[in-house]
């Protein structure tokens, strides 16, 4: 399959903002994609070479490397490329412009002989990009530049444009996983009615390229038989939130299992034979940060093939008391991990079992999952079952909540124990409800919002980003709707971090998945997630979250709490959750029903 066809579709997709049109065109691309490369095409659409959970390296070519490669490919001086880049502001367009001026293919040391421009095929492109990503050690920088220069030299202008953007991490297609799932269902199932089957398979095996390969080569019926696979993460089950214990117990029909909600890092732990792998909430491979935890699991959790879930929590080695979540940040550094492991010890608190020795436990009710989890855990002081009770009264839930807070937990997770209490992978529902600490605010809880824009500061902050445009996620439309502008709560260190984060993700135009009336100084690709608290939720004509006749919903006096690197944009607080918080706030504060006209 020719890569030029992919590039031409990318060019068309980039110009579309309607999700319906995006889905239709993406489906058309899949129909024209050869079955043996469809997984690679899906990865390219996602802007990656492989799923994050593989732990494989990224491309590793920054702006300066790309400028050198473009100059080498087209016979220009680096200064000329830099000047053109300053004028155009897009290295992909720079490559397109320079390649358009080159006639034929000049001599360049590159494996591939005298291949003519436009003859690149998808597998050739993919394999060369893999070589670039996996090139390490002495001289790897020059190898990466030379390989990429050779690749774009053989490319047509449109291919060069999207190859550069891919390597730079700026594809700008505006396509989320939900849109890909819709397109796969339409292409290989015949209609969007098959979306639940495709989505369930993806929730249990979070490798979108592999799901595309299975449905394209073996048919949609094959997806119905997909079950969890150790080594491939399951999309985590998510909880709803409520501030009132009485209302929570009503939702649970008067009886529920109540776990501590630990202030740690949620972890999905897979064992396949002798290999133990740990995935974050975002399904990234974080095994290297928790080598000690892998050893604990091997020692104390019985079985050779299983998937369990829990919370990794920093603890005081002397007292065993829980320590602040921030201590885990020390384990994210690339150097001296062994020292960090020794200095910042952790315990693992398990709360679920999804797969054990060939059996899918996601379809079993929670009491059965928990009983098996307790059965396979040997007594020890490193790995524990999450502290829990069975609550059948509101006062019992309330007392346990205060006990959890007093012992350093964030709150509690209240979980259904009924016959339908399955593990809903990738879904947010009322089977789990979180009750967190009251922040002494009209907002009963923090929210996790996505950065979609940034504003420059004034005075001593002049020339630097000092506030962020934040959005909630609308899962029905697969878009991000603005809800507030955050300018307070940042420490000096966090402000410095903000500059780097925003500069890496800034873009000239609004991302197609962002719905905003407010125009920031800089648009940002919706990738970063931050935890935010505010005074209350109000109606605002400036924001688009849950917009109705009177405006959208907005958070008054928002304050930054912390970055949530463990969450993906799609894990952010949803527009519906914001609406529910607003409704409950009105009921509590104004003692009148929610205005249905918003």
Curated annotation (Swiss-Prot):
Catalytic activity field = ATP + (deoxyribonucleotide)n-3'-hydroxyl + 5'-phospho-(deoxyribonucleotide)m = (deoxyribonucleotide)n+m + AMP + diphosphate
Q: Which cofactor does it need?
A: Mg(2+)
Arranged from A to Z, the UniProt key words for this protein are: ATP-binding, Cell cycle, Cell division, DNA damage, DNA recombination, DNA repair, DNA replication, Ligase, Magnesium, Metal-binding, Nucleotide-binding
Q: Where does ATP bind?
A: 259, 266, 281, 311, 351, 428, 434
PROSITE patterns (UniProt xref):
DNA_LIGASE_A1 (PS00697), DNA_LIGASE_A2 (PS00333), DNA_LIGASE_A3 (PS50160)
Acetylation as a keyword of this entry, yes or no, is no
One GO term in the molecular function aspect is: DNA binding
Kindly state a single biological-process term from the GO annotations of this entry. Answer: lagging strand elongation
In the Enzyme Commission scheme, what number(s) does this protein have? Answer: 6.5.1.1
Active-site residues are 261
Give the function comment from the record: DNA ligase that seals nicks in double-stranded DNA during DNA replication, DNA recombination and DNA repair.
Q: Which family does it belong to?
A: Belongs to the ATP-dependent DNA ligase family.
Query: Which HAMAP family does this UniProt record tie to the protein?
Result: DNA_ligase
Q: Which NCBIfam families match?
A: dnl1 (TIGR00574)
Name the UniProt record assigns to this protein: DNA ligase
Say which species the protein is native to: Metallosphaera sedula (strain ATCC 51363 / DSM 5348 / JCM 9185 / NBRC 15509 / TH2)
């Amino acid at each position: 399959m020719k890569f030029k066809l992919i590039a031409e579709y990318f060019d068309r997709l980039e110009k579309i903002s309607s999700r319906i049109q995006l889905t239709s065109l993406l489906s058309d691309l899949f129909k024209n994609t050869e079955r043996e490369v469809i997984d690679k095409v899906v990865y390219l659409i996602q802007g990656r070479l492989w799923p994050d959970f593989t732990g494989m390296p990224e491309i590793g070519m920054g702006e300066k490397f790309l400028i050198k490669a473009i100059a080498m490919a087209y016979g220009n001086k680096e200064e000329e490329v830099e000047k053109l880049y300053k004028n155009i502001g897009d290295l992909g367009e720079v490559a397109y412009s320079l390649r358009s001026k080159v006639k034929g293919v000049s001599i360049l040391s590159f494996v591939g002989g005298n291949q003519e421009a436009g003859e690149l095929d998808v597998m050739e492109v993919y394999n060369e990009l893999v070589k670039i990503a996996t090139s390490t050690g002495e001289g790897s920088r020059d190898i990466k530049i030379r390989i990429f220069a050779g690749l774009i030299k053989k490319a047509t202008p449109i291919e060069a444009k999207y190859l550069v953007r891919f390597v730079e991490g700026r594809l700008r297609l505006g396509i989320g996983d939900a849109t890909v799932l819709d397109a796969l269902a339409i292409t290989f199932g015949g209609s969007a009615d098959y979306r639940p089957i495709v989505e369930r398979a993806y929730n249990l095996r979070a490798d979108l390229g592999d799901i595309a390969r299975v449905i394209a080569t073996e048919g949609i019926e094959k997806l119905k038989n997909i079950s969890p696979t150790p080594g491939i993460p399951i999309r985590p089950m998510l909880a709803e939130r409520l501030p009132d214990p009485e209302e929570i117990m009503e939702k649970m029909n008067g009886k529920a299992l109540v776990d501590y909600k630990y202030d740690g890092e949620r972890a999905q732990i897979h064992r396949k034979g002798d290999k133990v792998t740990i995935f974050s909430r975002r399904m990234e491979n974080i095994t290297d940060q928790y080598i000690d935890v892998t050893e604990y699991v091997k020692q104390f959790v019985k079985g050779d093939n299983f998937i369990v879930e829990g919370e990794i929590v920093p603890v005081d080695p002397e007292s065993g008391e829980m320590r602040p979540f921030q201590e885990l940040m020390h384990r994210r550094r690339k150097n001296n991990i062994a020292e960090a492991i020794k200095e910042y010890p952790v315990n693992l608190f398990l709360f679920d079992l999804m797969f054990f020795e060939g059996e899918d436990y996601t379809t079993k009710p929670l009491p059965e999952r928990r009983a098996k989890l307790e059965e396979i855990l040997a007594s020890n002081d490193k790995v524990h079952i999450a502290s829990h009770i069975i609550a059948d009264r509101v006062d019992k839930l309330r007392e346990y909540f205060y006990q959890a807070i007093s012992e350093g937990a964030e709150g509690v997770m209240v979980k259904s124990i009924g016959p339908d209490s399955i593990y809903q992978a990738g879904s947010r529902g009322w089977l789990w409800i979180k009750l967190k600490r009251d922040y002494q605010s009209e907002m009963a809880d923090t929210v996790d919002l996505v950065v979609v824009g940034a504003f420059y500061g004034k005075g001593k902050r002049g020339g630097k980003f000092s506030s962020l445009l934040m959005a909630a996620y609308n899962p029905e439309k697969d878009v991000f709707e603005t809800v507030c502008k955050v300018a307070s709560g940042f420490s000096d260190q966090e402000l410095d971090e903000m500059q780097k984060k925003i500069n890496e993700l800034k873009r000239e135009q609004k991302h197609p998945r962002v719905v905003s009336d407010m125009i920031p100084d800089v648009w940002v690709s919706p990738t970063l997630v931050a935890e935010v608290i505010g005074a209350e939720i109000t109606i605002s004509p400036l924001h688009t979250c849950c917009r109705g006749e009177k405006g959208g919903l907005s958070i008054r006096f928002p304050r930054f709490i912390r970055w949530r690197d463990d969450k993906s944009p799609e894990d952010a607080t949803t527009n519906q959750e914001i609406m529910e918080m607003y409704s409950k706030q009105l009921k509590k504060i104004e003692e009148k029903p929610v205005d249905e006209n918003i």
